[in-house]
């Protein structure tokens, strides 16, 4: 993904799925993901759930590995968003994230709360020097690593939750990335601020907004 910043075609539309617009930078990941699942399924039959993914017949939906296996016979479901934040990273504007989770396969009854292993990996911009990787196994806590992109050295760190008791002098956001939702989102943000700290004083600007 970092190397793709040098290409001019990464922002081209590859196709329109039922869930979103799929760009070239997204579709370039699919063959890599499919090859990985083909190899993994030799030892662990799995169901891959990913946005815009289609089966051999071009039908969007979960894909079973190895090919030909019934979905109910797979051991696990792998839920993946290879690039969460496509639009920011494809213009080299800000980091995106690669998200993955693994849950026991219960077919259509499988729920996100049943995920046993999860990994969140930063996909940095071309000018970044380091990238964060956060992973967790149910019952075993979280492992956080910061990878130096120059020499692949790793530094461990421990994220902490904020101790703030108010949103005053802090960030508060209602995501509204696309036109069509901005008016409602703005009204909701104003309502939240008014309920939590009272009417916002624009001369003080004590509540900050950051869509990312």
Positions of the model-derived regions?
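An extended, acidic
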Residues: 2, 115-117, 121-212
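Short, flexible, glycine/charge-rich loop motifs used to bind or transfer phosphoryl groups or to couple energy/partner
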Residues: 66-68, 108, 160-162
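Short amphipathic alpha-helical surface micro-motifs
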Residues: 28-31, 79-84, 116, 150-157
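DPxDG-like acidic metal-binding loop motif
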Residues: 71-139
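N-terminal subdomain of lithium-sensitive/metallo-dependent phosphomonoesterases centered on the IMPase/IPPase/PAP
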Residues: 1-83, 208-211
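Alpha-helix capping and helix-coil boundary motifs
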Residues: 17, 108-111, 166
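Alpha-helix termini
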Residues: 4-5, 38-45, 104-110, 125-126, ...
């Amino acid at each position: 993904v970092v190397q793709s910043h040098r290409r001019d075609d990464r922002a081209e539309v590859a196709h329109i799925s039922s869930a979103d617009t799929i760009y070239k930078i997204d579709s370039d990941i699919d063959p890599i993901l499919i090859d990985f699942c083909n190899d993994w399924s030799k030892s662990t039959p799995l169901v891959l759930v990913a946005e815009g993914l289609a089966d051999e017949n071009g039908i969007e939906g979960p894909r079973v590995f190895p090919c030909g296996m019934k979905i109910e016979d797979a051991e696990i479901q792998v839920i993946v968003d290879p690039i969460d934040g496509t639009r920011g990273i494809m213009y080299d504007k800000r980091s995106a994230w690669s998200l993955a989770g693994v849950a026991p396969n219960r077919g259509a009854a499988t729920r996100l709360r049943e995920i046993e292993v999860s990994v969140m990996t930063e996909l940095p911009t071309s000018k970044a020097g380091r990238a964060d990787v956060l992973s967790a196994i149910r019952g075993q806590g979280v492992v956080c690593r910061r990878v130096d992109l120059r020499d692949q050295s790793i530094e461990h760190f421990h994220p902490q939750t904020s101790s703030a008791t108010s949103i005053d002098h802090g960030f508060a956001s209602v995501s509204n990335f696309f036109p069509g939702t901005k008016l409602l989102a703005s009204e909701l943000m104003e309502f939240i601020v008014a309920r939590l700290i009272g009417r916002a004083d624009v001369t003080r600007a004590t509540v900050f907004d950051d869509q990312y």
